[in-house]
From Swiss-Prot:
It comes from Anaeromyxobacter sp. (strain Fw109-5). InterPro entries: AlgH-like. Belongs to the UPF0301 (AlgH) family. HAMAP family: UPF0301 (MF_00758). GO terms for cellular component: cytosol. This is UPF0301 protein Anae109_0457.
């Protein structure tokens, strides 16, 4: 069984406990990208939004939309990364190869990198071999000590980030349940005190 994340929550996952009351995060799996004394930043990686990759790309560049259609990526949902800055586009991808040297790309850890530049977006969308990536709008943010209090209250259960498979290889609708089982639990088998990230 994977061990819980160490005291620093990033890189790692936060698994929402079943009774988490915040509608922004109920049933969510959050990839934690930053966690330090000034707060924390993460991305919900299992909540599809109302727009597709094609719709977002069409607002950037019609040629990119056509490239996504040619690569079979156009119909994929853009995920709701969180309630903070919902208009901001983020790109989550596997480092190495396509996009590895793109401007602004930063490693999250254990097989995942994050960016938001147009250069990175173009490289990934046009890649002929189909390197996996996710587009996310918005992020989840926590003030200093907020996420620690929420974890202590039972709103979230930390899970170690052991690779990118939970993000890219597990179907969207199964990610939360898979994470719960990796904790050695069954869905519905643990309780929550409350809490939620900032909006």
């Amino acid at each position: 069984m994977p061990s819980p994340a160490p005291s620093g929550l990033a890189p790692g996952f936060l698994v929402a406990a079943p009774a988490l009351g915040d509608p922004n995060f109920a049933g969510s799996l959050v990839l934690m990208a930053e966690h330090h004394g000034e707060g924390a930043l993460g991305f919900v990686v299992n909540r599809p939004g109302p727009v597709t990759v094609a719709e977002v790309l069409a607002s950037v560049d019609e040629d990119l939309r056509r490239a996504a259609e040619a690569n079979g990526r156009a119909g994929a949902p853009v995920l709701v990364g969180g309630p903070v800055q919902p208009e901001r586009l983020w790109i989550l991808f596997r480092p190495g190869g396509i996009g590895a040297d793109a401007e602004g790309a930063v490693p999250v850890g254990n097989g995942l990198s994050l960016g938001g530049s147009r250069e990175l977006l173009e490289a990934l969308v046009r890649a002929p071999r189909g390197d996996p990536f996710l587009l996310l709008l918005g992020y989840a943010g926590w003030a200093p000590m907020q996420v620690e209090r929420e974890v202590a209250a039972g709103a979230w259960v930390p899970l170690e980030l052991e690779g990118s498979d939970l993000v890219f290889d597990v179907p969207l609708e199964q990610r939360w349940e898979t994470a719960v089982r990796r904790l050695g639990l069954e869905p519905g088998g643990f309780l929550v005190g409350g809490g939620g990230a900032s909006a």
